[in-house]
Amino acid sequence: MYLSRLPPRSIPCRSINQISRVVARSSKSRLEFVGSYQNSLTTNQTRCLRPFSSTSRSQLRDYFPEADHEHIKKTEAAWPHPNYPKEQMLTNISYAHRTPKDFSDRIALYLVRFLRFSTDLATGYKHDPVTITENGEKVLKKPYRMSERKWLIRMVFLESVAGVPGMVAGMLRHLHSLRRLKRDNGWIETLLEEAYNERMHLLTFLKMAKPGWFMKFMIIGAQGVFFNSMFLSYLISPRTCHRFVAYLEEEAVLTYSTAIQDIEAGLLPKWTSPEFRIPDLAVQYWKIPEGNRTMRDLLLYIRADEAKHREVNHTLGNLDQNEDPNPFVSEYRDKAAPHPSKGIEHIRPTGWERNEII
């Protein structure tokens, strides 16, 4: 490329002075920026404990900061969370599977297994179980693949679609009640509360991880497919949909149980660090007492919620979809006998049979 040479040109002294002042100001601002940037990095390293993010550490911020209003001090949850004693979460909650009894149950189970395979593939989930040797030592057969970051990726993706079934079912039952000019017998509130609870799980994890554009794209696609599939399926067979959600919650209980075992085995050091703090959102929603605010405690609460959803949907799948009342908000004649409730003191992992409660 040919460049023409221009004759040399003298620069006035006044221009030289102006240029010198500009350079001095820019150098000073640059030094101030570097200093503030280093301070922000140091602050984020000590204060920001978000293990997974698609952005650089210096760009991390509160994913949905609380707005400061002139007249409103605080907005409480629409559905206050019931109290879960820690002893009950440890003794009453565990993985359980309901054996399919008819063709509808088998269809629901096969769909859940396919969805589980697809989700594992999408989130990169691959867990190597811990084996116990004769000496009682815990040994991994293969190099461990799950980390805090991978667990959060999986949890964010799962909870982003877990709130869909309850909202779809509640919406359709609401419209069904309007068309029939009849009461719904309490189903709508429980289904909407379930969707709300799943959304609180998502918001809690978003306080620890900010998804990138690829995760957001996956969530949009999964939500679009899942919502429309649930919408059409619930119109055809509500009972099959409730069984499907119950089997899905069985997998959720298994997932969180595995994560809790990993924490207890010391495989997730960032979550067992004394500096780690769970989000204040979780403390306020679950009313977590002081001294029980570790990541393990948080996952115990979330696992208990998933176990409750498992019980609710297995039970609703056993009832008459049009006539039976919601047993989880009903008042029983014999209050001393075990019966469905919002708590976990009498939780039934595979659901209550119709002849036990109606």
Curated annotation (Swiss-Prot):
Membrane topology field: Multi-pass membrane protein
EC number: 1.-.-.-
Cofactor binding comment, as recorded: Binds 2 iron ions per subunit.
Subcellular location: Mitochondrion inner membrane
Pfam families listed in its UniProt record: AOX (PF01786)
GO MF annotation terms: alternative oxidase activity; metal ion binding
Binding residues annotated for Fe cation 2, in chain numbering: E198, E249, E306, H309
Cofactors that this protein relies on: Fe cation
Cystines in this chain: none
One biological process term in Gene Ontology: alternative respiration
Enzyme class: oxidoreductase
Amino-acid positions noted as binding Fe cation 1 in the UniProt annotation, renumbered to this chain: E159, E198, H201, E306
Annotated binding of Fe cation, by residue: E159, E198, H201, E250, E306, H309
Main location: mitochondrion
Gene3D superfamilies named among the record's database cross-references: Alternative oxidase
Annotated InterPro entries: AOX, AOX_sf
GO-annotated cellular components: mitochondrial inner membrane
Keywords: Electron transport, Iron, Membrane, Metal-binding, Mitochondrion, Mitochondrion inner membrane, Oxidoreductase, Respiratory chain, Transit peptide, Transmembrane, Transmembrane helix, Transport
Bilayer-crossing regions: 152-172, 217-237
Chain's role: Catalyzes cyanide-resistant oxygen consumption. May increase respiration when the cytochrome respiratory pathway is restricted, or in response to low temperatures.
Family: Belongs to the alternative oxidase family.
Name of this protein: Alternative oxidase, mitochondrial
Taxonomic lineage of the native organism: Eukaryota, Fungi, Dikarya, Ascomycota, Pezizomycotina
